[in-house]
Amino acid sequence: MAAFGRQVLDWHRLIPLTWACMARQTPHLGEQRRTTASLLRKLTTASNGGVIEELSCVRSNNYVQEPECRRNLVQCLLEKQGTPVVQGSLELERVMSSLLDMGFSNAHINELLSVRRGASLQQLLDIISEFILLGLNPEPVCVVLKKSPQLLKLPIMQMRKRSSYLQKLGLGEGKLKRVLYCCPEIFTMRQQDINDTVRLLKEKCLFTVQQVTKILHSCPSVLREDLGQLEYKFQYAYFRMGIKHPDIVKSEYLQYSLTKIKQRHIYLERLGRYQTPDKKGQTQIPNPLLKDILRVSEAEFLARTACTSVEEFQVFKKLLAREEEESESSTSDDKRASLDEDEDDDDEEDNDEDDNDEDDDDEDDDEAEDNDEDEDDDEEE
């Protein structure tokens, strides 16, 4: 009996030790409650379009009065949104818990909730989930949605179809980050426009499927470019500069403006530092690498590649712009002259037709007179 009593006392001594051990091993439980309240701090959105208000009941991330402050915050938020308090608080906590599981920090979640602009919490969660499935990390997702919050209003089915289409183009598995930074409208633009750009690169520019994927990844601005301008830019590199397909892809040539390309290329050409290769791909002088022409700043280009002063290059750019204006004006004059010639030819043809019609009428009149004379002769006989 005495032994049993000692055993009971030992159990009582072990109970507080067990709870202390559990508290040390799971410190995140209390922290998670504080985190949830801190995340709710900036969720109050005005009904006229998304101005975030700081609520006085929330003080800092380190100390939050719970549960009264949290209840007041959620109630204030949901009253502004016209949502039932119990239902809305549960939805907020569920969405925030999901975002935390995806790897978003407190700051990330605050930013995302501040840019949702009328989109429902479920819509926000669905769109973000699609981005995560495409291989994006939390930081790029926040940057893209802050830059283009209209993406949150996309129908989720459209988002999923576009995601599947981009994966077929090879833009999944983390390759979509740069595309979204440079061209976030890839999810909102017509799929036919994307198809037209891809078809142009494959059929007219003769890039391989792998090269097209690399171009879309490294030069996503081609998706916004006029197709005629894009084709001319490729032809300028291939025929005028003598650059082959692998070098065009490797140097990311298509991301640069045609003005910049022509200015630097023609400047080097007139300095005698660049030659268009012959049919065998040979030149009398070694041409500078494309990366040393386009992928450097203007100061570095002039100092290392062209070896001239800034003043000389500025004068050249003005002269080149004047030459192109004169060339365009002469081209327009030639077109106008050719149109005038065509109109004159049409007028001459119309006049010839009128003359022929008059001749036909005269012949008909002569025939009618001859027939009348023959009839008169017959009557006299």
From Swiss-Prot:
PTMs per UniProt: The mature mitochondrial protein exists in 2 forms differing at the level of their N-terminus, one is starting at residue 43 and the other at residue 48.
UniProt keyword terms in alphabetical order: Mitochondrion, Repeat, RNA-binding, rRNA processing, Transit peptide
Record's keyword annotation contains Mitochondrion: yes
GO molecular function, one term: double-stranded DNA binding
A Gene Ontology term for the protein's cellular component: mitochondrial large ribosomal subunit
SMART domains (UniProt xref): Mterf
Transit peptide: 1-42
A Pfam family reported for this protein in Swiss-Prot or TrEMBL: mTERF
Keyword Transcription belongs to the record: no
Annotated region (Disordered), positions in chain: 322-381
Amino acid composition bias (Acidic residues), ranges on this chain: 340-381
Subcellular location(s) per record: Mitochondrion
Record region (Dimerization with NSUN4): 310-327
MTERF repeats: 142-172, 177-204, 209-239, 245-270, 290-318
UniProt-listed GO biological process terms: camera-type eye development; heart development; mitochondrial ribosome assembly; mitochondrial transcription; protein targeting to mitochondrion; regulation of DNA-templated transcription; rRNA processing
Function of the molecule: Regulator of mitochondrial ribosome biogenesis and translation. Binds to mitochondrial ribosomal RNAs 16S, 12S and 7S and targets NSUN4 RNA methyltransferase to the mitochondrial large ribosomal subunit (39S).
Record remark on domains: The MTERF repeats form a half-donut shaped, right-handed superhelix, where the concave side displays a positively charged path for nucleic acid interaction.
Oligomeric and partner information: Heterodimer with NSUN4; this interaction may be required for NSUN4 recruitment to the mitochondrial large ribosomal subunit.
Family: Belongs to the mTERF family.
Protein name, entry field: Transcription termination factor 4, mitochondrial
Organism: Homo sapiens
